[in-house]
UniProtKB/Swiss-Prot annotation:
GO terms for cellular component: plasma membrane; rod photoreceptor outer segment. Responsible for the synthesis of cyclic GMP (cGMP) in rods and cones of photoreceptors. Plays an essential role in phototransduction, by mediating cGMP replenishment. May also participate in the trafficking of membrane-asociated proteins to the photoreceptor outer segment membrane. The lineage of its organism: Eukaryota, Metazoa, Chordata, Craniata, Vertebrata. Pfam families: ANF_receptor, Guanylate_cyc, HNOBA, PK_Tyr_Ser-Thr. It comes from Bos taurus (Bovine). Residues 47-465 are extracellular. This is Retinal guanylyl cyclase 2.
Length: 1103
């Protein structure tokens, strides 16, 4: 997952929205506020800009009560809060966490893990080794790190196969091996409780030990009942030479009842007398407290206390304080709820905390070095990490392997406290003796095994019977073959399913393809022959569609067109005869094998299969569209000059394509020149292969081919019964010979024979004499003519294979490679005289496009400003002593928006502003901007016009008000669109703001006042300030104004304002303003009567 700062555009979008909600402060205040916010945001640390890195903590927190005692949410909260406050960690991101409950069944746990992949940036877990490898592969696919404390799978040690996986603790197997090697205990037994997570753990532990060459005698599962425990212990006693018993279950010291019962029964069966040593596996995953920590379960159960004398507890070494002390200190600081007692919390709490800190340390290293962190780089930068965790020192070496220290704890049958005996140094993988020796029952450890078990590069037989070993190997081989066969079957089924539903699906529908006008679907035309453009139909409320500038205007459908667009590329559809195909499942089940085989065909000279179209009763093969049309089209086009080198290159492409098909045991059966297409690079590709196979599989009838269609068919196939779709490799060779004749003479098959096609077919079917085309010698080299005659031999067995054809064809150029480039260069020399005209034509087109671009730029910015920006010059702010500004907005726009669909609001504003834009074109004004329903126009800038600016704005306002009186919304025609207009004159400063999408903006108190004139105006009214009225009266052009009175303008106090109601000579009708209420005001929204009328019409339409 790539980590980068939060896009600034998101902040701008939020800020603009806030500005619109506070529009009453005016544009200048809005701009000032925007600048202040920009300065504040730019000063914020990177964590404010960047999205949080969310860590998913995965474990069986709800289905296993002992796992739930780890309090994962509190541990994750404590770690993330400390990390986010830690000044030494410069992560560039704030850390967050999310708790994912892992089902206790591995299969369901994997399913839930997959469903969580979009909810987190990285994962701590899983806790169940049963799906660790799958989770790691998924994490690699998602580019999300998997940091596990429980995965024991030895396959995960491969950094190449699992680049996004890392362990936050040393591998438990490495720790066990270090201890076993020191005491020379090679023969092990593994026993687990019957919970699924521990069953999978047991099998992974056994598999990992066996991968290191150690003999694991038994792998057993037991419940809490006495019968299953006794049976399991008896099996261990019967196994050969077991020294160490690894218990994969919850430790009895933290409440594991199964282990308690197991040790009690082992004591009763006298298995705790020193013959065996019992090692709890789960204590390898956390730091078990032992310093001054009595355990009640040992004190209250004498039998268990005696049995525990045979137990060696291996756990992560604590530092200055135990887990309980660290927990109580955090509670005292208020970081953890004080109501939680430390002895009620599982030490796994610290492991979860350390894992989150482990990710933070890796991210800190990655950000320091690269400035960003992906999942793989997080794992890479988890090397050489050292930090103090919850109460442990966490370390890794240069390879990323954990080297945190472990301690071996022991007790005797008299005590209920644990004491340290050995320190397991994982950096050197050696044991260091402590102050107290291990107290083994009977005074001595279990008997040591041969040293060879731990010697690298040596095979230790260990008393295994060679015959038994051979039988085991054979059994494993049979099992492996069975598994491979089953896996192949499953993979085959998955491939079939993916053909229909996966990202590689090949059954397409109308939702996947867009058909192009049928005028061009009648034959394989080139891209250049079709001119199409996207026509926007936003005003009509419809989605954009394709329209064509030439040819038929008949709408393109799957029934009348063979050309379509799929994923941005042009494709060609070869339709099958109409028939009853049934549903999509029936097509898939009967033809999926052929679909898969055709999909796998990949060669430069094979037109690749894109898929199969099946919709609306149409079934078709979908292949890539080749712009040079078919070989038949090229041969018939006399404008294309073909020398022999060019022809031989096309023939060689055909030979290589057919050679590939025949090597894949794929007979074409329909080979002809029109089934050979040529792409834009003049590479010939074979297409329409597999057509007959699908016809047979789907049992589709086919129309009797015409005599012209049979001219490429081999004689033996022509003589077959009617209706049969025979095809053969030799028949393809015959078809190739006919294509050679077409290429040599640039004519149709048998074009030199003055006979109808039907009679030619009859002569071919009934020799003697053998009837074949006659090709004059001057059309091709003699050896090519000879090859052609061999290929159309009457006896099929006498025809060469395409391997032989290929070998002969290579020798025809006397050692020279058939290079179509040389031929094309000669063609270019012939056409070089036309290049100057072509360049001139393109230059003129470029100039036209340049003019269009400049015109568009001048529509967005004033011409002088646009010219300065094009030259790369700085646009200095310009002051204007006196201009007139126009503001207007739609009354009740919020209500209209709430009652309308978003596209209807867009249509409304587009229709209204299009109307306004047409009006301002006849006045000397400049449109500044539109924001939502607000429309801003100025006169007197950027081009000064003396005192005319007030008259121009006043005339434009009257025209706009008159046009709005008759304007109707398309979706709400019964609701009137009322606007209110505000005018004000005064000085402003204009300048260009921003580098990306620069805007021409106005600044000054005049902008504020004009906005206040609009916001304090009334519907269907032109609210004019005193300064504007003074200018209008000075001009003396007969403007009619009415005194409104003194109006409260926010930030300006009370000022005298006026209504502009007309002008002498202005004859256009103006809408009648709504009546003024008793308080002298009218509503600034829609009337209830108008809303009710719209709702009644909407209800009727829904009926």
């Amino acid at each position: 997952m790539f980590l980068a700062p939060w896009p600034f555009s998101h902040l701008m979008l939020w800020f603009v929205t806030l500005g619109r909600q506070r529009g009453q402060h005016g544009l200048a205040s809005f701009k000032l506020l925007w600048c202040l916010w920009l300065l504040v945001l730019m000063s914020l640390p990177l964590q404010v800009w960047a999205p949080p890195y969310k860590i998913g903590v995965v474990g069986p927190w709800t289905c296993d009560p002992l796992f739930s005692k780890a309090l994962p949410e509190i541990a994750a909260q404590l770690a993330t809060e400390r990390i986010n406050k830690d000044p030494a960690l410069d992560l560039g991101h704030s850390l967050e966490y999310v708790i994912f409950n892992e089902d206790c069944q591995a299969s369901r746990a994997l399913s839930s893990f997959i469903s969580h992949h979009q909810m987190a940036s990285g994962f701590i877990g899983p806790a169940n080794p049963g799906y660790c490898e799958a989770a790691s592969l998924l994490g690699n696919s998602w580019d999300k790190g998997i940091f596990s404390w429980a995965c024991v799978n030895y396959e995960l040690d491969s950094k190449n196969s699992h680049p996004t996986f890392s362990r936050t603790l040393p591998s438990p197997i490495r720790v066990l091996l270090t201890v076993m090697k020191y005491f020379q205990w090679a023969h092990a037994g593994v026993i687990s409780s019957d919970e699924d997570i521990w069953v999978h753990t047991a099998y992974r532990v056994a598999s990992a030990l066996r991968s290191r060459g150690l003999p694991v005698g038994v792998v057993l599962t037991t419940g809490q009942d006495s019968q299953s425990i006794q049976k399991a212990l008896q099996q261990i006693r019967q196994a050969d030479r077991i020294r160490i018993i690894i218990m994969c279950m919850h430790s009895t010291l933290i409440g594991g009842e199964t282990q308690t019962h197991l040790l009690e029964w082992a004591h009763d069966l006298q298995m705790t007398d020193g013959t065996y040593v019992f090692v709890p596996y789960d204590t390898l995953l956390y730091s078990l407290p032992y310093k001054h920590t009595p355990y009640k379960v040992l004190r209250n159960n004498p039998k268990l206390r005696e049995a525990y004398d045979a137990v060696l507890t291996i756990t992560v070494e604590s530092q200055e304080k135990t887990f309980y002390q660290a927990f109580e200190e955090a509670a005292a600081r208020g970081e953890i709820p004080e109501k939680l007692e430390s002895d009620q919390v599982s030490p796994l709490f610290g492991t979860i905390y350390n894992s989150i800190y482990f990710i933070a340390q890796a991210m800190n290293n990655a950000m320091k070095e690269n400035g960003w962190a992906s999942a793989a780089s997080l794992v890479q930068h988890s090397r050489n990490v050292q930090f103090y965790g919850f109460n442990q020192l966490i370390r890794t070496d240069a390879n990323g392997n954990g080297i945190s220290e472990y301690v071996i704890l022991d007790t005797n049958w008299k005590e209920w406290e644990l004491h340290s005996t050995y320190t397991v140094d994982m950096e050197t993988e050696l044991l260091r003796f402590g102050e107290t020796p291990i107290h083994f029952p009977g005074g001595r450890p279990p008997r040591a095994d041969a040293q060879c078990w731990f010697a690298d590069g040596r095979i230790c037989q260990g008393g295994i019977n060679p015959t038994f070993a051979l039988m085991v190997c054979l059994a494993l081989l049979i099992a492996l073959l069975s598994i491979n066969g089953f896996a192949y079957f499953i993979r085959h089924r998955i491939n079939k399913i993916q053909l229909i539903k996966g990202p590689n699906r090949i059954l397409l529908t109308l939702e996947d393809v867009t058909f192009i006008n049928p005028h061009f679907g009648s034959k394989r035309g080139s891209h250049a022959s079709v001119s199409f453009q996207i026509t926007s139909e936003v005003q009509s409320g419809r989605s954009p569609r394709l329209s064509f500038s030439s040819g038929s205007l008949t709408p393109a459908t799957c029934e009348n067109s063979n050309i379509a667009i799929y994923e941005g590329d042009w494709v060609w559809l070869k339709k099958f005869p109409s028939g009853n195909f049934g549903d999509i499942k029936s097509v898939e089940s009967s033809a999926s094998d052929i679909f898969e085989m055709m999909k796998d065909l990949r060669h430069e000279n094979i037109n690749p299969l894109v898929g199969f179209f099946y919709d609306s009763g149409v079934f078709a093969i979908v292949t890539e569209f080749c712009s040079r049309r078919s070989l038949e089209d090229i041969l018939m086009n006399q404008d294309v000059k073909l020398d022999w080198m060019f022809k031989s290159s096309l023939l060689l492409d055909l030979i290589k394509g057919m050679k590939y098909l025949h090597h894949r045991e794929f007979a074409h059966g329909r080979l002809k020149s029109r089934n050979c297409v040529v792409d834009g690079r003049f590479v010939l590709k074979v297409t329409d292969y597999g057509f007959n196979d699908i016809l047979e599989t789907l049992r589709l009838s086919q129309e009797e081919p015409s005599a012209e269609e049979l001219l490429w068919t081999a004689p033996e196939l022509l003589r077959a019964p009617r209706g049969s779709r025979l095809r053969s490799f030799a028949g393809d060779v015959y078809s190739f010979a006919i294509i050679m004749q077409e290429v040599m003479v640039r004519g149709t098959p048998f074009c030199m024979m003055d006979l109808p096609a039907k009679e030619i077919i009859e002569r071919i079917k009934k020799p003697p004499p053998v009837y074949r085309p006659v090709v004059p010698p001057e059309h091709a080299p003699p050896e090519c003519l000879q090859l052609m005659k061999q290929c159309w031999a009457e006896a099929a067995e006498q025809r060469p294979t395409f391997d032989e054809i290929f070998n002969q064809f290579k020798t025809f150029n006397k050692g020279k490679k058939t290079n179509i480039i040389d031929s094309m260069l000669r063609m270019l020399e012939q056409y070089s005289s036309n290049l100057e005209d072509l360049i001139q034509e393109r230059t003129e087109e470029l100039e036209i496009e340049k003019q269009k671009t400049e015109k568009l730029l001048t529509q967005m910015l004033p011409p002088s400003v646009a010219e300065s920006l094009k030259k790369g010059c700085t646009v200095e702010p310009e002051g204007f002593d006196l201009v007139t500004l126009y503001f207007s907005d739609i009354v009740g726009f919020t209500t209209i928006s709430a009652m309308s669909e978003p596209i209807e609001v867009v249509d409304l504003l587009n229709d209204l502003y299009t109307l306004f834009d047409a009006i301002i074109g006849s006045h000397d004004v400049y449109k500044v901007e539109t924001i939502g329903d607000a429309y801003m126009v100025a006169s007197g800038l950027p081009k000064r016009n003396g005192m005319r600016h007030a008259a121009e704005i006043a005339n434009m306002s009257l025209d706009i008000l008159s046009s709005v009186g008759t304007f109707k919304m398309r979706h709400m025609p019964e609701v009137p669109v009322r606007i209110r207009i505000g005018l004000h004159s005064g000085p402003v400063v204009a300048g260009v703001v921003g580098l990306t999408m620069p805007r021409y903006c106005l600044f000054g108190d005049t902008v504020n006042t004009a906005s206040r004139m609009e916001s304090t105006g009334l519907p269907y009214r032109i609210h004019v300030s005193h300064s504007t009225v003074t200018i209008l009266r000075t001009l003396g052009e007969g403007y009619e104004v009415e005194l409104r009175g003194r109006t409260e303008l926010k930030g300006k106090g009370t000022e005298e304002t006026f209504w502009l109601v007309g002008k002498k000579g202005f004859t256009k009708p103006l809408p009648v303003p709504p009546p003024v209420g008793k308080d002298g005001q009218v509503g600034h929204g829609l009337q209830s009567v108008e809303i009710a009328a719209f709702q009644r019409r909407k209800q009727k339409s829904s009926w």
